[in-house]
Amino acid sequence: MAGHDSGNARRGRASFGAFVRKPVERDSVANAGQAAEQGSPEATQAWPDDAVEVGAVVDAYGLKGWVKVATHADAGRGGDALLNARRWWLERGAERLSVRIMQSKTHSDTVVAQPAGVSDRDAALSMRGFRVFVRREDFPALAADEFYWVDLIGLEVVNEQSVALGKVSGMIDNGVHSIMRVEYPATGKDGQPTTDERLIPFVGVYVKTVDQAARRIVVDWEADY
């Protein structure tokens, strides 16, 4: 989503691996490599430091070892993370796997993929329930003034008078534009410390700068709004 352009407000879609891509369904197959690049899902304890959860395996697709993934962002938007990554990291309870993806494509509102070494429907069905992660470095590059929601979480929010408003705890898509959920410390009715929340539209009229290096967002917003 563009921090300076309210016309880009519909681009972000989800809080995990969230994309800001154009809302066009991808029908073409994204090839993960040559068919000769073989291998099977491998148990692993090593886990990428930049792993981001982007979906979950919900079913098999067809008879030849393809899996169906419900994405945390609409296919063709957030689903692009799955299409772009050549390796997925899977987690189900205490079980962790690393798998190379041979092919992937969108299918309706899901992403379907062929993991290396998974050759039939039964093997694909055995993968149901795995949460799917990809490395943040595998996300497609964005245009200027576009941001992944996952990169906004945790950033400090201040107004133009340098008054601290809190930190981004999450994002909401209301169908028109994205909204930042900004948590800040407060005092409850019982006098005990608690947290409260501000909802700030993530559109150019309010969001003035997003400095990811400084982990700060400057907004035109007052503390008593």
From Swiss-Prot:
InterPro entries: PRC_barrel-like_sf (IPR011033), PRC_RimM (IPR056792), RimM (IPR011961), RimM_N (IPR002676), RimM_N_sf (IPR036976), Transl_B-barrel_sf (IPR009000)
Subcellular localization(s) per the UniProt record: Cytoplasm
Any one GO BP annotation for this protein: rRNA processing
Presence of keyword rRNA processing: yes
GO CC term (a single one): ribosome
Domain PRC barrel positions: 144-225
One protein family per Pfam: PRC_RimM
Entry keyword set: Chaperone, Cytoplasm, Ribosome biogenesis, rRNA processing
GO molecular function, one term: ribosome binding
Entry comment, domain topic: The PRC barrel domain binds ribosomal protein uS19.
Subunit structure: Binds ribosomal protein uS19.
Family: Belongs to the RimM family.
Role noted for this protein: An accessory protein needed during the final step in the assembly of 30S ribosomal subunit, possibly for assembly of the head region. Essential for efficient processing of 16S rRNA. May be needed both before and after RbfA during the maturation of 16S rRNA. It has affinity for free ribosomal 30S subunits but not for 70S ribosomes.
Protein name from the UniProt record: Ribosome maturation factor RimM
Taxonomic source organism: Burkholderia cenocepacia (strain HI2424)
Lineage, highest ranks first: Bacteria, Pseudomonadati, Pseudomonadota, Betaproteobacteria, Burkholderiales
